[in-house]
Amino acid sequence: MAMETCFRAWALHAPAGSKDRLLVGNLVLPSKRALAPLSVGRVATRRPRHVCQSKNAVDEVVVADEKNWDGLVMACETPVLVEFWAPWCGPCRMIAPVIDELAKDYAGKITCCKVNTDDSPNVASTYGIRSIPTVLIFKGGEKKESVIGAVPKSTLTTLIDKYIGSS
C-alpha cells in the first residue's frame, strides 16, 4: 500500500517527458487506470505535495561524549535521560533495549543519550559515576536524579513522567 501510494505520487508529479525511471525490481504495480484518477489538465495545475514526512522529534538514543556533552545535555530545553554504560557490562546490555523503547515512547518530550564510560571517562567522573549502568535525569542543564543498576522500564517511566509534567 505504501509503495503504491508513493508510486502514485511519483507518477502524478513526474515532469512530462521526464527521462527519470522508477526502478521497482519485481514489484507488481497497479494498472495505469488506477494510477490516473485525475485529468491531465488538473494534474498540471496541482502543486507538488509531500507524501511522506519524517518526525521532527528524535526517537532514538543519541551518543553523547566529551565533545558534544554541553550541546546535547546541558543546553537542552527538554529533560534529558543519560545512560552511562560500557560495552563489556552485562546489565548495561540488559537495559539498552529499555532505553531505546523510552526514546521512542517519549520522542519530542525528552532526549535520551548514552555515554560510553570507557570512551568518555571525564564526563563519568564529573558526575561521580562509579557503577554502571547509571541513568541520570537532567533538566535545564542541572542533574536532577539518578538511578543505578538495570531497573525495570516502569521505574524509568515514573521518573521521566515526574520531569516532563513539571516546568
Swiss-Prot record:
GO terms for molecular function: protein-disulfide reductase activity. Gene3D superfamilies: Glutaredoxin. Residues 54-165 form the Thioredoxin domain. Keywords: Chloroplast, Disulfide bond, Electron transport, Plastid, Redox-active center, Transit peptide, Transport. InterPro entries: Thioredoxin, Thioredoxin-like_sf, Thioredoxin_CS, Thioredoxin_domain. Disulfide bonds join 89-92. It is found in: Plastid, Chloroplast. It comes from the Eukaryota. PROSITE patterns: THIOREDOXIN_1 (PS00194), THIOREDOXIN_2 (PS51352). NCBIfam families: thioredoxin. Forms a complex with heterodimeric ferredoxin-thioredoxin reductase (FTR) and ferredoxin. This is Thioredoxin M-type, chloroplastic. It comes from Zea mays. The lineage of its organism: Eukaryota, Viridiplantae, Streptophyta, Embryophyta, Tracheophyta.
